[in-house]
Amino acid sequence: MQMAVINQTPVTRPQSGVLRLERILPGPLERVWVYLVEADKRAQWFSGGTTMSGVDQTATLHFQHSNITDEPTPERWKEMDDGGFKSEVTVLRFEPPKLLAYTWPESKGMSEVTFELSPVGGDTKLVLTHRRIGSTANEVSFASGWQSHVDALIQVLNGDKPTGFWANVLKLERDYKATF
């Protein structure tokens, strides 16, 4: 599948409680890997917090979306600006530079996020899978969030500041509510 096509494909829901997103990211595995695990680089597209370094590590994800975009934050996510929001995850798998998995706290217990990286020419294929999601409402939220954050990662890897982040989140949320 060509980069332009795969990067337009929406998040899929192979079964209830499971989301999957595939993207071709610009740059080699090693470069993409550091944007997943190093806190300062991850903060540019997703969340800062703790640099991830191995299995069984408890890591803090510090969400502060004002680090990602200059757009005004929608009201219901304002907490992400005012000091941010912190979430603790446990690293389940750590296989540099190809595989990272960690727990994800949600309202009905822990879900699990896996990032799989593989080389595609000089670029990197990302397969992001989020499992054990407790509700359709959370699936909608995670699908729109993951797609928007990975779109921001692509912009960062291209040397750009992410644009259109919140507009993307809101549009995708409407789309996934209708789909899921």
Please give the residue ranges for each predicted region.
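A short, structured loop/turn motif at beta-sheet edges
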Residues: 29-30, 52-55, 92-97, 117-125
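Beta-strand/loop substructures that line and gate deep hydrophobic ligand-binding cavities in soluble
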Residues: 14, 18, 101-147, 153-155
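Tryptophan-centric aromatic hotspots in well-structured domains and transmembrane helices
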Residues: 33-36, 45-46, 89, 104, ...
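Charge-dense, helix-prone N-terminal extensions
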Residues: 4-8, 86, 121
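Hydrophobic ligand-binding cavity/cleft-lining segments
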Residues: 1-55
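Short beta-edge strand/loop motif at the mouth of beta-sheet-based domains
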Residues: 40-84, 165-171
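Hydrophobic/aromatic beta-strand elements that line small-molecule binding cavities or substrate pockets
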Residues: 23, 49, 86-93, 112-119
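A conserved amphipathic terminal alpha-helix motif
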Residues: 4, 131-180
